[in-house]
């Protein structure tokens, strides 16, 4: 009896309370006051100078930037942004794309075979984390990705987005 839908007893829709203080918490940024004071600039998460495969994974084994101030202070050329979306994909595991790319830990892969240029040696690259994703709205999620891309571009760095799907 509890498993069957019953008109009058069960609602046929779930309403979102857009007035709730928790409605937009998926994209509320952590207040800077909660973080210890530090000089602006990219943060290296590696414990060992040799790098290796241990430690906290980042895109291309690069340092992490948390804010536009970090991008400017670090004179960053390329900021890699994760966009873990899978709402427009028939395969619902695309959301794990950015995490999987970080876990590969292969750096930039060395020199390009056509140009013989190693982007990791000529560009200052950082991991800018993931854009916040609203699992209930592709539109709101894509807007958040756009906002992070704009935030990166306004510092003069080139945004490089790794998804997810093609939402």
Give the role of each language-model region:
Residues 2-167:
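Metal-dependent C-N hydrolase catalytic cores
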């Amino acid at each position: 009896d509890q498993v069957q839908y019953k008109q009058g007893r069960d609602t046929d829709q779930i309403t979102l309370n857009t007035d709730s203080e928790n409605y937009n918490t998926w994209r509320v940024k952590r207040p800077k006051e909660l973080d210890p004071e530090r000089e602006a600039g990219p943060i290296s998460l590696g414990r060992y100078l040799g790098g290796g495969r241990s430690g906290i994974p980042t895109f291309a084994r690069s340092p992490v930037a948390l804010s536009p101030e970090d991008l400017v202070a670090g004179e960053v050329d390329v900021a890699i942004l994760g966009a873990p979306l899978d709402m427009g994909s028939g395969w619902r595991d695309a959301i794990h794309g950015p995490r999987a790319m970080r876990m590969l830990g292969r750096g930039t892969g060395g020199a390009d075979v056509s140009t013989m240029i190693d982007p990791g040696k000529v560009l200052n690259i950082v991991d800018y984390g993931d854009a916040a994703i609203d699992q209930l709205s592709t539109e709101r999620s894509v807007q958040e990705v756009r906002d992070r891309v704009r935030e990166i571009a306004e510092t003069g760095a080139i945004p490089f987005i790794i998804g997810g799907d093609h939402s």
